[in-house]
Amino acid sequence: MINFKNLETPYTIAEIGGNHEGNFQYAKKLCQLAINTNVDCIKFQLYKANDLVNPKISPERNNHFKKFELTKKEYIYLADMCSEANKDFNASIWSKNMTHYINKYMSFYKIGSGDMNCYPLIKSFLKYNKPIVISTGLATMDEIVNTVNFIRNENSLYAKNSMINLLQCTTMYPIKNNEANISVMNEYKKINNVGVGYSDHTIGSDALLLAAIYGANILEFHFTDNREDKVFRDHQVSLMPNEVNKLIQDIKKFKLLSGSPNKFPLETEIKNGHIISFRRAVYLNKNLKKGHKVKEDDLIALRPMEGISSVHFEKLIGKTLKIDIEKYEKLDFNFFE
């Protein structure tokens, strides 16, 4: 079972979503382009419009989603494409009666922002005991905590580490930079045993890089072949294949640059002798005779740190020399009393 918090670099999800616009041939093309990148997971949306939008109250919205539907056979074909290429397949499932035939392809379940408080849908996924990833657009912190508590009350397995993962998201296409609110991930980290991540709707990839630096375990972004001359809005916030590979390369570089939160001398510093050569020791700045009482102006702190560290500079003031010592000679505490 995948644990997103144990990965060395963030888990990346290329969200094709509805960018195929109901055209299966185009869906296959986008899927293959995503497979050819270094992304970890390729994601779609599974639904029947009548299970998602009320056709009486919102007929235009219902018709929009109907145009973007694919068939069961087509969804399975796309899932098999990913599986055969050793890429993870995933989908936001908006019609719970579609879960049974796609579950075997899913290593986790993704809840979109609009469904983060749709408890009947969420409950239908919990019987599979797979990690849950939840986008949190539109939500208050109280609503997020309530959803986490609902899941854990329904199935205690989800109290375990990284079984629930919260993605900061702003539900608009595109959003301004000041609407990304990536810092919210720090609040999510305070919820016991959850993983955190970011689902991006900005233009470009800067927000994703920042989220990686902030400790995102999961990064989700929309994916397309080309943003030019596209009417459907999601294309405008989507990354293209070369941009995906550049992003993943940059994430790995930035994670290396971030390093460890534990401060200690690194092997390269030790091996090259820099602890000695860069730090200072205490030396006499003049020749002095046995019996001389050391004054501050007799001492100087110089590189390299051979002998007595400059940390002990003050300790030598007022000491008496037990032997004659030459200027710049390496010192030892045994020379003083």
Model-derived features: positions:
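Catalytic cores and adjacent flexible loops of soluble metabolic enzymes
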Residues: M1-E337
